[in-house]
Structures are given as C-alpha cells and as structure tokens.
A protein has these predicted regions:
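A short gly/proline-enriched turn/hairpin at secondary-structure junctions
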Residues: 64-71
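Surface-exposed, charged secondary-structure patches
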Residues: 80-119
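Solvent-exposed, acidic/flexible segments
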Residues: 31-35, 47, 55, 71-75
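Short, well-ordered alpha-helical segments enriched in acidic and aromatic residues
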Residues: 50-61
C-alpha cells in the first residue's frame, strides 16, 4: 500500500514540476488580472481621441496606418501620428463590429470610426508579450 501512495505522490510531483517548467511568460496566469482587460481602455481612448492614453498600450514598435502615413513606428512617434490623426479627424463615434483571437497571444478588433461625414474602418491587434498586452497594429482606413 505504501508503494502505491508513493507512486501517486511521485506522479503528482512530476506533473506539477512539468507544468511549471513548461509555463510561458507570454501567457496570462490566474494571479495577473491585467490580461485581456485593455480592450475597453483602448476603445475608450479611441472614442475620446486620447492619444496619450492609447500610446500607453503601444508595443515598442507599432505598425500604423492613417491617411497620409503608413509604416512601422516607434511608440513615441506613433503617439504623435495618432494625435495628429485625432486632431484632423475628431471622433463623432466609434464602435467595435467584430473581435476575436487569431492566435493564443493575439486578439484582433475591427470597428467603425466616424469623424463628421468621414467613416474609417479601424483595425487593431493586441498581443501578449512579456506578461503585458500591447497594441502592435493600428489602422484607420
């Protein structure tokens, strides 16, 4: 009987050690609540044209597209470009039409951004990297 108990405890210990050893820093754990929570904050920053707030969630490099500008930009430069976009096209409304996961660490959002008589399709992706969510693609087309 003691051999059976020993085998059960050994199996549990091996399972726990394997689970901990193969954990990834790119995936959220139950102790960290910041994961998958920036979506509403990003949406609010876009609705209120708050470029500084939006930039808090930018990855160190952002693939950005707005009228007249397209490319990969550093976080600070991307903030200035978005601030200029919001200045030229202040939001009258913004809504998310679709969202989903394109991979275990990437969530995409597709929305409609209206500014006066202009309507833009807004697309952005949020990735989980180093235990943080970050915007790595943002497009207003």
């Amino acid at each position: 009987m003691t051999k059976a108990i020993y085998i059960v405890f050994l199996s549990i210990a091996i399972f726990c050690m394997t689970t901990l050893a193969h954990g990834s820093k790119n995936y959220p754990d139950s102790l960290t609540q910041e994961f998958y929570d920036i979506g509403p904050s990003v949406q609010n920053a876009i609705k209120t044209a708050n470029a500084a707030k939006l930039a808090q969630y930018f990855n160190s490099s952002v693939n950005l597209q707005v009228p007249g500008k397209s490319g990969s930009f550093g976080k600070t430069q991307a903030e200035f470009i978005i601030k200029d976009f919001f200045s030229n096209f202040p939001p009258s409304s913004f809504s998310i039409n679709n969202q989903g996961k394109s991979s275990a660490t990437t969530t995409y959002y597709i929305g409609t951004y209206k500014s006066g008589s202009k309507t833009f399709r807004c697309y952005y992706t949020i990735i989980v990297f180093d235990n943080k969510e970050r915007i790595n693609v943002l497009k207003f087309e």
